[in-house]
Every structure is written in structure tokens, then in C-alpha cells.
Amino acid sequence: MATGELALVSSLFIVVVFLLLGAVAREASALTRHDFPEGFVFGAGSSAFQVEGAAAEDGRKPSIWDTFINQGYMPDGSNADVSADQYHHYKEDVKLMYDMGLDAYRFSIAWPRLIPDGRGEINPKGLEYYNNLIDELIMHGIQPHVTIYHFDLPQALQDEYGGILSPRFIEDYSAYAEVCFKNFGDRVKHWATFNQPNIEPIGGFDAGDRPPRRCSYPFGTNCTGGDSSTEPYIVAHHLLLAHASAVSIYRQKYQAIQGGQIGITLMVRWHEPYTDKTADAAAAIRMNEFHIGWFLHPLVHGDYPPVMRSRVGVRLPSITASDSEKIRGSFDFIGINHYYVIFVQSIDANEQKLRDYYIDAGVQGEDDTENIQCHSWSLGKVLNHLKLEYGNPPVMIHENGYSDSPDIFGKINYNDDFRSAFLQGYLEALYLSVRNGSNTRGYFVWSMFDMFEFLYGYRLRFGLCGVDFTAAARTRYLKNSARWYSGFLRGGELRPEKSYATL
């Protein structure tokens, strides 16, 4: 080798060594928000039914969740009639967000507040409230990220035609979504059509432990009717078509003028095999297809996953060629809500005469929301899965959080350092995923405030900010995690000696 060539190789070797050392040093140093790409959004979230209160004020009418609660189906007997009462405290709440340094606030619009009967007249008081909230956020430099539907279907539509189980839902939802675009889209630039449409069909129409309480034996009991083997798939199909319809309206009539983006938010749990058996490994892959691919596969490829087609058969609705064209690509981003891993085992579906979603998937596993474990590596697996299987779509992490122990029910609790540790682990895992090519563009903590939690009432509290539910004024207070997150948002370091990314 000539002297010049040797010198060139030596120089290149030194450069490579420095780059590698820099990468190692970067992993060992403290992480700050400035290590994320420019424009990366950090925020926190809520939903209308859970945080607003004012359940019977200013023209709002009941949702299916109001009915569910009033009929006595909440295990702890609680309700969301007042909850954190953001309806009356939104200015105070936005000031808290501003003081903490949030880039964005994710919230939902209550369909029964904006259009109380589900269709027809707009409630002027509802319109006023959301305009005021959006304006207050923008005045404080906080982006509004709006979910159009977060489980709170107007009871009027459930009574009239069975709600989401009927294809009539698609037209009514589309009209409601257009009201939102028309009235708020000049200021709202980030829309999600649905929150967790891959969960509502299971709870409401398979297990029947959520409204409208439809199920069939042996998959649920004490239901109002239903068929657990077919209705979850029908409902999911209607949600998918309603999503595509709303996106089509937005793109054809509003997007070019308003300059916003629209997507959908899915629950994305990660499934791992319970044992090292080949059957359990296959079950985990299959369950990720049933859970994530149920919506993402048609959104990206235009049809349901092949494994669902083969295992569900004729009970899985067909996607017509015209519907496939509307559904495929009907997103500018994918929102994901991720909390934990479920370890699953394979079961023999052929031995089951009666079938539902989980029998069709051929898996069993434990879903323990009350005891969330920190497996932050799972977020990396989720984001890598989206990158490899679905073309690396733009992603917004719309929910990630940890609940206080039920033992502190009814108490004011500032000390939630484990929440800070939990979030730090996931932020570190998120950073590594972004560095490795994930197209993730935002992260929202669930939740901004303590509030009513679906099925759990006030026993589980996810808030960065606490709420004194014993006080009529619903006094807010900053927990330790709120101060920790605020420090990060303002450029502070996530200390490496307190790293939880491997948990």
C-alpha cells in the first residue's frame, strides 16, 4: 500500500473511531429535549368526558358513558359529573400548562356537548366553550391537538339506531366531524378522528364491560344483547369507514385552506410470548396483527391482515374495492397510545365451538391496567414494528403514562417519583428509536390532570397535576412528576445515573 493511501486509511479510521466514541458518549450523557429533532412536540393530554365535568350544564346531553355510569356499572360507584371540572377551570388549566412549558395539549371534543342529539342543531354554549379553550391555548403558545371522538357517543344515537353497530353512524359521525373542521379548523392543525377504535369494539361488543354492554355467553354476562363473535368486527368496520369518510371530507374541503393534518389514534400494546415455546412466539406475532394490524393494515394496505381473514372468515366484513381506495392512505400521521406489554400464550382455537376476538386470535394473556409495569424497551419494539411493517409512518405518541396506586384513593399525593422514573425510561427509549430512524414526531404524557378513568373512576390517577376531588373548587396542585417534566421541557437533563431505559 502506498504511503498516501496508508495515510488516507489512517485518517478515515481515526474519523470512524471518533464518531463511534461520540455515539457512545452520547448514550452515556444526559438526555435533553434538544436531542430530539427540531419541531418535535412534547405535551400532555386528557379527554372531554374524563376531565370536563359539567355533565348536565349548558345544553350537554348524555353520552353512552353517562348512561353506563348512571345504571350502576362503575365498580367504585363513581361518576364524571364534575370530575376535574375543566369546563369551569380551563383558563387556570391552560395557565398551568404554560407555566410547565408544554408545547401542546391533547384534548377531545364532546359530541354530546357540541351536537347534543348527535345530529342537527349545534349547541351554541358547546361551541363557545371549545372556541374559548382553543383560543386560550393559542394565546399561551400551546398547540391544540384535538380528538374528534373519544368514546362518548351521544346516547340519542344509541337509542335511535344502535349507535356504532349501525352503518347510519358513519353519516352522522362524518357530519359531526365536519362541524369541528368548519368551526375550529382555522386554529386546530392536528386532528385525530378516533381514540382507540381497536379497543371500543372489544369492551363494548365482546366482553360487554363497557357501554353499550353488548356481548354473548360465555364471553360476557349481564349484557343488553349482542353477539361477541360478529359485532366487534362490524363495529370496527364502521369506525374504519367513518374515519375514512371524515378524512375525505377534510382533505377535499378544508385541508388546503386550513393547513392541518389528520390521523387516527390506536391503542398499541406490545405482545410478547409468555414462554420460549414456538407456539407462544407465533401467538404473540398473531396477536400483534389482530391488535395493531386490525386498523393499520387496511390504513396502509387497503384490507384487513391475512391472518384475520383466514381465522375470522366470513364474520370479518369485506372491504370493497371503492372502500379500500378510500381507506388506504387516509392518514397524515398515526397516533399511538402505549403503556405496557402483554405476555401471551397460544390456545387451540379449533377446540372452541363458541368464538370471539381472542378465540379467533388463538391467544390468552393478562391485561392488568391497575398494575402497569415499566417495560420501556417495548416502545422501541412498537416503533420498530411500525417502521418495518407499515412503511415508517409519521407517529405521534398520544398517550404514555403511569397511574398512582389505588392505595392513595381520596388523598392528596405529591410524591410520585416512580411516575417520573417511568416516563424517563420511555423518553430514553423513544430517543433511541428516533435516532434509529423512527418517524416519531411527538410525545404526550397521559395525563395532564388527575381525572375520571374509564372503568376505574378515581382509583387510578395518571395526572402530572393532582386534583383535590374533596374540594368543591377542585384545587389543582403540581406533583413531583409535573416539576420533573417541566424541567425536561425547559431544557433540563434526564440524568444518566437515574436511567430507567432498560426496565
From Swiss-Prot:
Glycans are attached at N222, N436. One of its GO terms (biological process) is carbohydrate metabolic process. The keyword ATP-binding does not apply. Disulfide bonds join C215-C223. Residues 1-30 form the signal peptide. InterPro entries: Glyco_hydro_1, Glyco_hydro_1_N_CS, Glycoside_hydrolase_SF. Belongs to the glycosyl hydrolase 1 family. This is Probable inactive beta-glucosidase 33. It comes from Oryza sativa subsp. japonica. The gene is BGLU33.
